[in-house]
């Protein structure tokens, strides 16, 4: 099929089981020829295969494996490598780390970022190792209950404190690629979604609660369902309100202001009380205004079991009770369903084959992970009014993903098998009007990938990176203590280099703290020394000739050999410095600090 002048060779393998047979697809070669890219995937234009370990396993290859791969005459070596990686435990761990970043990068419950990521990551790794389908994973995330330190599937619910509006927004953004939260207070500015549709989605979640577990050590929370209303227990009498008012009115002027309630339970909500009850707009609440405050609606969820759409013209009004309806398909919830039944129904609607957005969101995101940009950008803001690049290809992949039973590995293998993916990554001129996907685009490595790459290049254990000092294991130190040190080092590094994977690549920028870390880290300086038993020292002892040593350093850090011009620059610099060890220290340090090391290039 000829699709807008782009050639990709997208071979879709047959689907196992009762699904249809695979669809072979070849696109025209005109666009690739216009960019002087060999449409048959010539060696000089192909990305070194082992570098793909970063994409699929979050780590760099050993320099020796790069050389062996390039020398291997097997014409199927790339497809074999990809298949081996996708079916490895490292792929499962890599995907778990990716989805950890997706969920927690926008968490509104800050405590979840300290408690949940390791548990979620372990649970998600297990899902991928068991080759769980994407619909089952999402179903578990939407219907989970239990201790957040024990059940990793509670991550999404805990990350947003069980708040219905936040969960509706993130469910749509992550799993459907639609940012329907823009319709929270008004019609969506660019898509057809209406305000009522956002609140109908939120109405699947009002009975979710996140509460602290009593006497739990260490401190923990649990996701539970609250199906019985407690409204009758929460409205104090006018007399009780009068006593509270007089106790808080410290200057006895008959008016409560913010400074007077600063140390009380009302402090967090006082601005909202003013907005709702300050009839004369004098910046305070009289006793009469205080007693007339409307009962809290959605803002005091402890007592609500239904979702209300606020009346924007009457802020003091709780609003209209909304019944659950899934906006993408129109699926409705019957009355009388409890929390778990509602969330299960929502999961069924979200993952249904009738809901095209479920497959579209995952396919678009996966294509972006591997090729640096999606068919629609941003990847979490597609929407029905957006155009996608090469819709025929996109629809083919979405249809195949759906009919395969949402087989994650199959989708990765199909995309990784395209010539667009296997070609050398080439930046595209943003002013170039030609279609995308002649090859993958440069993209910033995730924090885990940089961390693992540094471990490989420096030849150190993960007990050190991210920590202020480099300490080896002390005599008598337990494995558990070492494990905690490794975890702490990675956690600190992720806090410095982490970013939301849903962010478009052009919006991901390095910052000063990251640059200072790479330039000034005592560990990096210590491990790029030419003396002792560092990686660099061993390379220099192994290769007395400078050209071989330069090539080995490039293979170690960038997984490729230097170009002729790079080799000349290195030779000239070594001659200029006059000290072999010092010159190679500068070379290795500069490569570790290069944009190529931090990116897929």
Region roles according to the model:
Residues 240-251, 270-281:
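Primarily EF-hand calcium-binding motifs
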Residues 186, 271-274, 291:
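Residue-level detector of alpha-helical secondary structure
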Residues 252-261, 279-290:
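Acidic Ca2+-chelating loop motifs
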Residues 458, 465-475, 479, 483, ...:
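Long, His/Glu/Asp-enriched segments that create or flank divalent metal/ion-associated functional microenvironments
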């Amino acid at each position: 099929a000829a699709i807008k002048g782009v050639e990709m060779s997208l071979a879709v393998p047959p689907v196992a089981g009762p699904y249809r047979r695979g669809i072979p697809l070849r696109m025209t070669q005109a666009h690739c020829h216009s960019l002087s890219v060999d449409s048959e995937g010539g060696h000089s234009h192909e990305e070194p295969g082992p570098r793909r370990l970063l994409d699929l396993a979050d780590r760099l290859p050993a320099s020796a494996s790069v050389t062996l791969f390039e020398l291997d005459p097997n014409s199927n070596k790339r497809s074999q490598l990809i298949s081996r990686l996708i079916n490895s435990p490292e792929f499962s761990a890599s995907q778990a780390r990716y989805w950890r970043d997706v969920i927690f990068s926008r968490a509104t419950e800050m405590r979840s970022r300290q408690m949940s990521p390791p548990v979620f990551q372990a649970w998600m790794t297990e899902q991928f190792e068991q080759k769980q389908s994407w619909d089952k994973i999402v179903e578990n995330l939407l219907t989970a209950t239990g201790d957040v330190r024990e059940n990793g599937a509670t991550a999404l619910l805990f990350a947003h404190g069980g708040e219905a509006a936040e969960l509706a927004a993130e469910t749509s953004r992550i799993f459907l690629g639609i940012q329907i939260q823009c319709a929270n207070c008004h019609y969506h500015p660019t898509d057809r979604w209406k305000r009522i549709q956002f609140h109908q989605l939120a109405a699947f979640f009002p009975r979710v609660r996140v509460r602290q577990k009593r006497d739990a050590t260490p401190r923990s929370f649990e996701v539970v369902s609250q199906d019985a209303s407690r409204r009758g227990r929460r409205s104090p009498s006018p007399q009780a309100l009068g006593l509270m008012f007089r106790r808080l009115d410290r200057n006895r002027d008959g008016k409560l202001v913010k400074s007077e309630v600063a140390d009380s339970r009302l402090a967090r909500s006082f601005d909202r009380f003013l907005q709702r009850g300050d009839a004369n707009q004098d910046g305070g609440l009289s006793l009469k205004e205080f007693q007339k405050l409307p009962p809290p609606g959605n803002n005091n969820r402890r007592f609500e079991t239904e979702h209300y759409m606020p009346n924007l013209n009457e802020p003091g009004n709780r609003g209209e009770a909304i019944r659950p309806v899934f906006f993408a398909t129109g699926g409705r919830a019957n009355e009388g369903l409890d929390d778990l039944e509602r969330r299960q129904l929502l999961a069924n609607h979200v993952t249904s084959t009738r809901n095209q957005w479920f497959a579209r969101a995952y396919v678009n995101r996966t294509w972006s992970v591997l090729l640096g940009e999606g068919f629609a950008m941003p990847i979490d803001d597609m929407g029905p009014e957006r155009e996608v690049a090469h819709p025929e290809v996109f629809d083919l992949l979405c249809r195949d993903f759906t009919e395969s039973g949402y087989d994650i590995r199959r989708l990765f293998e199909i995309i990784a098998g395209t010539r667009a993916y296997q070609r050398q990554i080439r930046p595209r001129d943003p002013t170039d009007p030609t279609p995308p996907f002649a090859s993958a685009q440069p993209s910033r490595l995730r924090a885990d990938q940089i961390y693992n790459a540094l471990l490989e290049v420096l030849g150190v254990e993960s007990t050190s990176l991210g920590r202020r000092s480099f300490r080896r294991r002390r005599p008598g130190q337990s494995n558990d203590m070492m494990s905690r040190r490794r975890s702490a080092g990675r956690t600190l590094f992720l806090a410095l280099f982490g970013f939301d994977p849903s962010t478009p690549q052009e919006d991901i920028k390095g910052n000063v703290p990251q640059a200072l870390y790479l330039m000034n880290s005592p560990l990096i300086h210590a491990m790029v020394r030419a003396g002792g038993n560092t990686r660099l020292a061993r390379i220099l002892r192994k290769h007395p000739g400078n050209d071989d040593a330069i090539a080995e350093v490039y293979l170690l850090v960038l997984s490729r050999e230097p170009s002729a011009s790079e080799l000349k620059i290195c030779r000239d610099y070594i001659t200029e410095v006059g000290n072999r060890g010092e010159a190679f220290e500068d070379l290795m340090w500069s490569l570790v600090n290069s944009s190529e090391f931090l990116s897929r290039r």
